[in-house]
């Protein structure tokens, strides 16, 4: 017995040769705990290209939608062992898909209990329910009138097993659960969480409404970061703590050094003025001694956020965050665009993760310090 035959017997012990030439194999293939009868007839040269696969009616029905895939794999498999491994993989996928389509409908008592729980919450709070009753979406308004959704995914052993809950929160949301708990308990905890996050969302909404937020363009409720335009090619990136939203956030200024350095010095010198009783935006105005310009005002000026190399604002989800330090230029660039530009110049040089070269716009010296992101 050669190595190929031994491997076939080891992986498929129920499939045996029916003649000395080993051109006919018959037996069973196992998948998902079941055995399926099949017969494979090979030509004299044992090439799979001209082989025939004969299946039991049960196996034929399961593989019906995968007929072309099976034929293709048979045609391209180098030997019987390779084909059988691929056939088993296809069979596993087919059985899994069939099981998902044949999920048992919920019992009448399960549906009745679930409807009672939804009624206790209030039918006006129901946003959506799947026909299988496995996924339920509930809605709520917070104290500021913002609308929120919670998606509750019930498991097979509900209520013994806790459901999975999906929310658009900036912090983890875990449900306290016992076998006696219900949707009412989930919804109550959801409302409590909304109340604890009210101040955070108030802070973020004020920033979104009263400043020009460069990133993200359409922030979800879970977003804790904002990049805010301060003027021509200068911005501030902040990361807000959802649990302490009026405290000093993590921040960094983005732009040319001659603009960002004075702002950094001003903030450092006025940090003692930060008052957690005020909103985050008001505190930023006080310590920076500026009024955040509205988008309409900046767009009417010569403010530009397009990259000076690719001429686009967004590239792979990022906006330009590198700026020429020449006060007469100040052209913004995407990091990856500037990296590729400098790398292509024979006159540029590199020291560790810092590149030195000439600005594509004004030809003055420009420096690029690569971030941790891969270009």
Swiss-Prot record:
InterPro entries in the cross-refs: Fancl, FANCL_C, FANCL_d2, FANCL_d3, FANCL_d3_sf, FancL_WD-rpt_cont_dom, UBQ-conjugating_enzyme/RWD, Znf_RING/FYVE/PHD
Question: Would the keyword Metal-binding turn up in this protein's UniProt record?
Answer: yes
**Could you identify this protein by its name?**
E3 ubiquitin-protein ligase FANCL
SMART domains associated with the record? FANCL_C (SM01197)
GO annotations under biological process? DNA damage response; DNA repair; gamete generation; interstrand cross-link repair; protein monoubiquitination; regulation of cell population proliferation
Q: Which organism is it from?
A: Mus musculus
Q: Which GO terms describe its cellular component?
A: chromatin; cytoplasm; Fanconi anaemia nuclear complex; nuclear body; nuclear envelope
Identify the domain of life. Eukaryota
The EC code for this enzyme is 2.3.2.27
Asked if the record carries the keyword DNA damage, the reply is yes
Entry keywords, A to Z: Cytoplasm, DNA damage, DNA repair, Metal-binding, Nucleus, Transferase, Ubl conjugation, Ubl conjugation pathway, Zinc, Zinc-finger
Substrates-to-products reaction catalysed: S-ubiquitinyl-[E2 ubiquitin-conjugating enzyme]-L-cysteine + [acceptor protein]-L-lysine = [E2 ubiquitin-conjugating enzyme]-L-cysteine + N(6)-ubiquitinyl-[acceptor protein]-L-lysine
Q: How is it modified after translation?
A: The RING-type zinc finger domain is monoubiquitinated in the presence of UBE2T and UBE2W.
Q: Where are the zinc-finger regions (RING-type) in this chain?
A: 307-363
Q: What is its main location?
A: cytoplasm
Region ranges (UBC-RWD region (URD)): 104-294
Q: How does it assemble?
A: Belongs to the multisubunit FA complex composed of FANCA, FANCB, FANCC, FANCE, FANCF, FANCG, FANCL/PHF9 and FANCM. In complex with FANCF, FANCA and FANCG, but not with FANCC, nor FANCE, interacts with HES1; this interaction may be essential for the stability and nuclear localization of FA core complex proteins. Interacts with FANCI. Interacts with GGN. Interacts (via the RING-type zinc finger) with UBE2T and UBE2W.
Q: Provide the domain comment.
A: The UBC-RWD region (URD) region mediates interaction with FANCI and FANCD2.
Q: Which disease is it linked to?
A: Defects in Fancl are a cause of the gcd (germ cell deficient) mutant phenotype, which leads to reduced numbers of precursor germ cells and adult sterility, probably due to a reduced precursor germ cells proliferation.
Q: What does this protein do?
A: Ubiquitin ligase protein that mediates monoubiquitination of FANCD2, a key step in the DNA damage pathway. Also mediates monoubiquitination of FANCI. May stimulate the ubiquitin release from UBE2W. May be required for proper primordial germ cell proliferation in the embryonic stage, whereas it is probably not needed for spermatogonial proliferation after birth.
Pathway it acts in? Protein modification; protein ubiquitination
């Amino acid at each position: 017995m050669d190595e190929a035959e031994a491997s076939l017997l080891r992986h498929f012990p129920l499939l045996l040769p029916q003649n000395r030439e080993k051109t006919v194999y018959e037996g069973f293939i196992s998948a998902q705990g079941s055995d399926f009868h099949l017969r494979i007839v090979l030509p004299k040269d044992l090439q799979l290209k001209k082989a025939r696969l004969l299946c039991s009616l049960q196996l034929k029905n399961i593989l019906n939608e995968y007929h072309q895939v099976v034929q293709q794999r048979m045609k391209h498999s180098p030997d019987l062992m390779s084909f059988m491994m691929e056939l088993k993989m296809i069979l596993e996928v087919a059985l899994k898909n069939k099981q998902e389509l044949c999920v048992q409908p919920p019992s009448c008592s399960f549906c009745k209990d679930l409807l009672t729980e939804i009624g206790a919450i209030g039918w006006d709070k129901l946003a959506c329910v799947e026909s299988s009753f496995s996924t339920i979406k509930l809605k709520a308004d917070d104290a500021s009138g913002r609308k929120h959704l919670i998606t509750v995914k019930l498991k097979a052993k509900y209520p013994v097993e806790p459901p999975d809950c999906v929310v658009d929160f900036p912090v983890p949301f875990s449900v306290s659960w016992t076998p006696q708990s219900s949707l009412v308990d989930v919804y109550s905890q959801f409302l409590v969480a909304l109340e604890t996050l009210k101040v955070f969302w108030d802070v973020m909404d004020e920033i979104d409404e009263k400043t020009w937020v460069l990133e993200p363009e359409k922030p979800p409720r879970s977003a804790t970061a904002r990049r805010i335009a301060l003027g021509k090619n200068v911005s501030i990136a902040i990361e807000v703590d959802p649990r302490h939203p009026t405290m000093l956030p993590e921040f960094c200024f983005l732009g040319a050094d001659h603009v960002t350095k004075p702002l950094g010095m001003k903030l450092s010198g006025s940090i003692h003025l930060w008052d957690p009783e005020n909103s985050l935006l008001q505190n930023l105005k006080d310590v920076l001694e500026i009024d955040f310009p509205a988008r309409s005002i900046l767009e009417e000026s010569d403010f530009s956020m397009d990259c000076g190399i690719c001429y686009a604002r967004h590239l792979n989800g990022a906006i330009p965050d590198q700026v020429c330090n020449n006060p007469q230029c100040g052209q913004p660039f995407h990091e990856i665009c500037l990296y590729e530009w400098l790398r292509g110049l024979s006159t540029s040089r590199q020291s560790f993760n810092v590149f030195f070269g000439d600005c594509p716009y004004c030809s003055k010296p420009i420096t690029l310090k690569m971030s941790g992101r891969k270009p």
